[in-house]
């Protein structure tokens, strides 16, 4: 039996079989693009929801079937999409302002929009300016829609009633935060940390709650429009749902019974970080989650299903076991016994699969126990393969042949947390030389465009079912489409607090990508060979 036949049998006998029906099991090809990095002529300083629509058309034209985005949840004052203040609510910063109904009715609308659109010409996302300008516009806009009675719109009322499980806690939390000038929860007056006063908070901040509810309604409308367009064009949207949530979030504030303050999640020491990492993210109270039948998780999934056909589960191994730091700075896996962590992970992932039609894709990079990887296969859940890291680490250290990847996987040359391919080639020449030899290529210290294209082509021909690369790695095929300093093509440096994290802006506009003859010819050439 071939590996593909084995994978097919696994899928057919797995809890994920219903999730696979929409996508099918034939090879799929896609791009990963951070929404904040996009810009069109209408974008107001940051990528916006409706900027995805022309990219969907481009994907269909060139043979890409998947667009993967990073998390788009509301991250409050933080620029990291992985440090959200809500596990469900979308980020109003991504609203396409120029496309809002009645946007032109805002005082000095055209002048304000033009000023914000100029921010898209900066080489990076300038969050302070973007946030100040967009929030001012949204508040002016909201005053107008209140004036014309839009809050009485039946669709808005239906939305608020349907989504009240997460929407009410989010809007109250957001309102208190605004009232306290963005202060983190641990600095709030004691009265605001007691959710027994929740109904009183709703009354106290009624107008603010309505404002934040209406913004979520607008986010829902625009992302639903994107999803409908993607469906019509046979392009699948892939979201990103981190398994952990910020301690400064409405989830931890309101659903505190599902979280534990006994420790914080992180990563154990390894060869790259001898002290390990403390992410300062709260851990779950698994007992209470189970007792509540995973209602909190199911609510996240059911809302995300409005927008995505599949999604990345960041740090999926954490659903089995987490590296937990105690208050004394000591760390250990919880639980540590396979007899505990395998049933725990299997149970929650089975519940997750039953809760929606979306297909989860596991981010299982780093040190993952073999029994966890085997369990993911039995569940019908794909893992992730980064060719430069796929090596026989327990043996001779050689690279694993591209044709030997499990079909139940996604191949990606780079991630948002790594160097792009061309940057890694320069930063790690010894490793890159070994990689070139493995691929049968002549090594040069600087990765030539033709070699970049060859490696991209190979990445689309691995035995994985899914092949999804960062748009940065495709843009590098044309030097005029990337920064002269390749370090600015990197999206994030994990474990650092840096002004360069999460500010990456794609150099060309979406309009320029669509009309760049040399770039599009390169994409066509890649697809002609796979």
Curated annotation (Swiss-Prot):
UniProt record similarity statement: Belongs to the disproportionating enzyme family.
In which broad location class does this protein mainly occur, judging by the first location in its UniProt entry? cytoplasm
Q: Output the lineage of the source organism.
A: Bacteria, Pseudomonadati, Chlamydiota, Chlamydiia, Chlamydiales
**Per the record, GO CC terms?**
cytoplasm
Q: Which GO terms describe its molecular function?
A: 4-alpha-glucanotransferase activity
Q: Which domain of life is it from?
A: Bacteria
Species of origin reads Chlamydia caviae (strain ATCC VR-813 / DSM 19441 / 03DC25 / GPIC)
Listed EC numbers? 2.4.1.25
Give the record's keywords alphabetically.
Carbohydrate metabolism, Cytoplasm, Glycosyltransferase, Transferase
**Which positions make up the signal peptide?**
none
Task: Tell me yes or no: is Cytoplasm among this UniProt entry's keywords.
Answer: yes
EC supergroup of this enzyme:
transferase
Q: Which reaction does it catalyse?
A: Transfers a segment of a (1->4)-alpha-D-glucan to a new position in an acceptor, which may be glucose or a (1->4)-alpha-D-glucan
Q: What GO biological process terms does the UniProt entry carry, in alphabetical order?
A: carbohydrate metabolic process
> Which compartments does it reside in?
Cytoplasm
What protein is this chain from? 4-alpha-glucanotransferase
